[in-house]
């Protein structure tokens, strides 16, 4: 961990931005900014806006001269290596993962390929033209259709056995989409902090309970889902979740914090545990999983945000 030379330090919290996950990012950013102020940091909130205004952001950061940039952006531009490259070019220390790992994890197909090459179980999927997906079933139901490079369950469609035809996708879905086999079972997740000896590592396992599909509302609206922390699961499954999360974090080259999401089909035991995806910018809203896991292991939300700031470096 790269500690800061003096406190309080000036921290810019990047939030909002141009992606479909703008509202989630604004919620994350406000919460993190408040927590960091409570930890004694001089915090300035900066929203790059919705127009990919890189030049304007550079000018604003040059004006502020922050010691650290806390990246609370989600989705395209903020989570895919773009803003990370800009910050490295400006030689500004920043939180979370770097250019390569952010780009790799954001591209779900390539991330799965990397994880699978290292022996980790992932959900089978294909990339298909949007026009083909809306014209006919491209795989046996049930299956899931989603953008290859968005998160927070934005633009995710579940096509089940009862569907009479292919899904009707919204106009803002990309020309190519990911279609993946639906993985049944319980939704489990593990957050990982750091990548060096002495760092917290894997925190704990959460079991996410919902009354139906774990969609955007279930993730972010109060009462949309119930979280059991720590998860009440067999030790073998617990150990596998913790181990695979650290391995996935390492394989993709993640820095700071990541969160690995799973499905577990209880009837199949260990063979039923499969990775859905790895998030390099996990949500930090009041209902988010990573802050909740931190609290469960004795790390307050403020201390979690502080840890990320003190972990910030210029070359991630």
From Swiss-Prot:
The name of this protein is: D-alanine--D-alanine ligase
Task: Name one process (GO BP) from the record.
Answer: peptidoglycan biosynthetic process
Q: In which residues is Mg(2+) 2 bound?
A: 277, 279
- Known EC number(s)? 6.3.2.4
**Residue sites binding Mg(2+) 1 per the record:** 261, 277
Q: Name one GO cellular component term.
A: cytoplasm
| InterPro entries xrefs | ATP-grasp (IPR011761), ATP_grasp_subdomain_1 (IPR013815), D-Ala_lig_Van_CS (IPR000291), D_ala_D_ala (IPR005905), Dala_Dala_lig_C (IPR011095), Dala_Dala_lig_N (IPR011127), PreATP-grasp_dom_sf (IPR016185)
A single Gene Ontology molecular function, please?
A: ATP binding
What is the species of this protein? Jannaschia sp. (strain CCS1)
Q: Which residues bind ATP?
A: 139-189
TM segments? Answer: none
